[in-house]
């Protein structure tokens, strides 16, 4: 376990994480949070071989610098929560991690000492998407870009010793202080940056309205680049563009009167830019000139251009309209006439931006003299746009074919569903018929069983009658035999009578057993009928 005040080593990391893999370049994620027993204060060369590391967690430690991780070019997530990073110099090496997407510096002294550290990190790491568990928004990127680009311009101009005394008075320290005042009120929650910057702009609005900014610098490109050295008002304008739009009418009225100052400065001497008021910082006061180009299909033309149609420039433009190379035929689409046709969106809406682009190019070409270079440029542009239109039309045809295939598949599915439904109906009908036949068979068997029972009863009754009749006839025969037999045969009669009495007893027993058997069968039949 590491001790407070001692750096860690690669062997310590292996023992800490029980890492037995030889090639440390295969490690993608590493978590080394601090504990009460020991905290990391210096990394040293312990992460030298973790070259493919993408996630690193060093939270709850005592790091005073981030040296030792600048070689991790593939690092995407870095957690430095609750460490001892006190200044921007301590985190300066983070700008080498250009693939970094998530960074956490909360509860570090640098967060309180340098409130504009977010702008620095957003400007230094372009791919940063989340800082201190909050997303990096486009407004912060714009503010960082304006702030640090102006700082670079001021530094380069200071080295050339071109600024005058009033330029040195407004140094980068004042701008940094202004940014600090704004960023102090900037909350990390969504949507609070507008309120904070609006509050800052209201506090400094009265003081700025009384000041006049005058900055002169050499410009090799153009005297109209009014945003080379933006101030705090420019950053506020980025966040509060809606407020600027409300007052655009008042600013546009005052702008033409000041455009002559720019022209006079451009003619008098070297190129220079002069900011007279915050209005000119936000809106350019250069007047633009344009030439109206009428569409060949239009029937209505402005009254101010009716007398110019006979000029050679207009004749050349009309001739160019007839050229199929410069103006190829556009695709048209015919739709079915329906009652709700007005509610449907028209096809080919993609033609509008292309037509606007063509009109802009025509205006650009008509303002200058005719030369072969502009003509060939316009021809190439038209050819490219026609190719784009063909590609889009091909895409629409493909969509139509896909729609037709979808309709066919839907129709086929409907047919299959109908067939399946008919088969189900047939099967249900057959099942119902089978149930009815089973019911009929059950009724028939029940009736047959009832008939069998009735016949059994009749048979038993008939057997009873027969037995009774036989039992009645036996004594009469005995009496007749006694009268007819002579006396000498009395002994023999007695013997025969005894034999007959024994046979009658056996016969009676057999009849009784038969009756009992029939009764048992009858009971079994009745029980079977009751169970069914």
UniProtKB/Swiss-Prot annotation:
Q: Where are the transmembrane segments?
A: none
Please classify the protein's predominant subcellular localization into one broad category. Answer: cytoplasm
What Pfam families does the database record attribute to this sequence? LRR_9
User: Where do the segments described as Disordered lie?
Assistant: 247-268
Quick check: keyword Cell membrane in the entry?
A: no
- A single BP term in Gene Ontology: spindle organization
- Keywords, in A-Z order: Coiled coil, Cytoplasm, Cytoskeleton, Leucine-rich repeat, Repeat
**At which residues are the LRR repeats?**
52-73, 74-95
Residue ranges annotated for the LRRCT domain, each copy included: 108-147
Instruction: List the residue ranges forming a coiled coil, or say none.
Output: 385-532
Subcellular compartments = Cytoplasm, Cytoskeleton, Microtubule organizing center, Centrosome
Judging by the UniProt lineage, the source's domain of life is Eukaryota
What cellular-component terms does GO give this entry? centrosome; cytoplasm
Give the matching InterPro entries. Answer: CEP72-like (IPR055320), Leu-rich_rpt (IPR001611), LRR_dom_sf (IPR032675)
Summary of the function given for this chain in its UniProt record:
Involved in the recruitment of key centrosomal proteins to the centrosome. Provides centrosomal microtubule-nucleation activity on the gamma-tubulin ring complexes (gamma-TuRCs) and has critical roles in forming a focused bipolar spindle, which is needed for proper tension generation between sister chromatids. Involved in centriole duplication.
Family to which the UniProt record says this protein belongs: Belongs to the CEP72 family.
Q: What is this protein called?
A: Centrosomal protein of 72 kDa
To which species is this protein native? Danio rerio (Zebrafish)
The taxonomic lineage of its organism, from the top, reads: Eukaryota, Metazoa, Chordata, Craniata, Vertebrata
